[in-house]
Design a protein with these regions (language model features):
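A structural signal for multi-pass alpha-helical bundles of membrane permease subunits
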Residues: 5-293
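N-terminal hydrophobic targeting signals that begin at the initiator methionine
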Residues: 1-3
Length: 293
């Protein structure tokens, strides 16, 4: 019995350890090794830093990095404050049928990105039949080639992003709000604090762990965005590469051109960029600081 009690915890953890090794550690190590190789179906050849040196002068890769970082920053500006405000509003006493609203807000996240991307592509089509151009006609304006210019194309992309992920981030913030002790708000009421002061001095500081978590996953999600852009522009063929992302370029080199070694180098640079940005934001937000006793 004593022996089985000692072994049982390891048995329960074993499936997770195996899945971690098979689906995370092994692909990561393989990707690192392949980034130093020319890999094809016929075999592999060690080329050292060739792919990384080539990346330094690859204008398409630089465009993809710029687009991905810009997209990530814009989504942070949109998908942190807006879901937070919606969560506060949802938890307000003034809001009725809270469960219904939560379901409605979360439904877009359950929708296939392939379907939602196609719908947004039709909505923002350059023809007169596109819903957005029909709206422009009602306002007395001419049709706009939405997806052919960066500004209008990115408006469509960001709207698609907000439509899909606002509800998800809102639920994260709602879970954070539920963990705040209501006695703190009661104390603030006794001190005569208004709604704005309670949000600024009670809600916002105590939502810090949730906010840091949402920022962290949003950084990774923003930098790894691919399918939304791929579906909105019907493939990796956006005008002037306005929709080309790092993962989109990885897909183009690895899948479309069968240059897996170069694609792995792209993936490793993406990993380094994502880790660097998140380490900076975690340090800036004081995540690694020890709490004072």
């Amino acid at each position: 019995m004593l022996y089985s009690q000692k072994v049982a915890p390891y048995v329960f953890v074993l499936p997770f350890v195996i899945s971690l090794l098979v689906f995370w550690l092994y692909p990561l190590i393989s990707g690192i090794v392949m980034s130093f190789q020319d890999t094809s179906f016929g075999g592999s050849q060690w080329v050292g830093l060739k792919h990384y040196q080539k990346l330094a002068s690859d204008k398409f890769f630089k465009t993809a990095v710029f687009n991905s970082v810009e997209y990530m920053l814009l989504t942070l500006l949109l998908l942190i404050p807006i879901p937070m405000m919606l969560a506060v509003l949802m938890e307000s006493r003034l809001t009725k049928a809270k469960g219904v609203w939560k379901v409605i807000m979360y439904i877009p996240a359950l929708t296939s990105v392939v379907i939602s991307g196609m719908l947004f592509r039709l909505m923002f089509s350059e023809g007169d039949n596109g819903q957005m151009n029909q709206l422009m006609h009602l306002l007395g304006n001419a049709s706009i080639p939405w997806l052919k210019e960066k500004t209008t194309g990115w408006i469509a992309l960001l709207l698609l992003c907000m439509w899909r992920w606002t509800g998800v981030n809102m639920l994260y913030f709602i879970s954070g709000l539920k963990s705040i002790d209501t006695s703190l708000y009661e104390s603030a009421d006794i001190d005569g604090a208004n709604a704005k002061q309670k949000f600024w001095y009670v809600t916002l500081p105590l939502l810090k762990p949730t906010t840091i978590y949402v920022i962290t996953i949003s950084v990774y999600a923003g930098l790894s965005m691919f399918l939304e852009s791929f579906m909105l522009w019907n493939g990796n063929s956006s005008p002037k590469n306005i929709g080309l992302t790092i993962v989109g370029y990885l897909y183009k080199r690895g899948i479309e051109k069968n240059d897996m070694g170069y694609a792995c180098a792209v993936g490793m640079v993406l990993l380094i960029i994502a880790l660097a940005i998140n380490v900076v934001q975690l340090v800036a937000t004081g995540t690694f600081k020890k709490e004072e006793k």
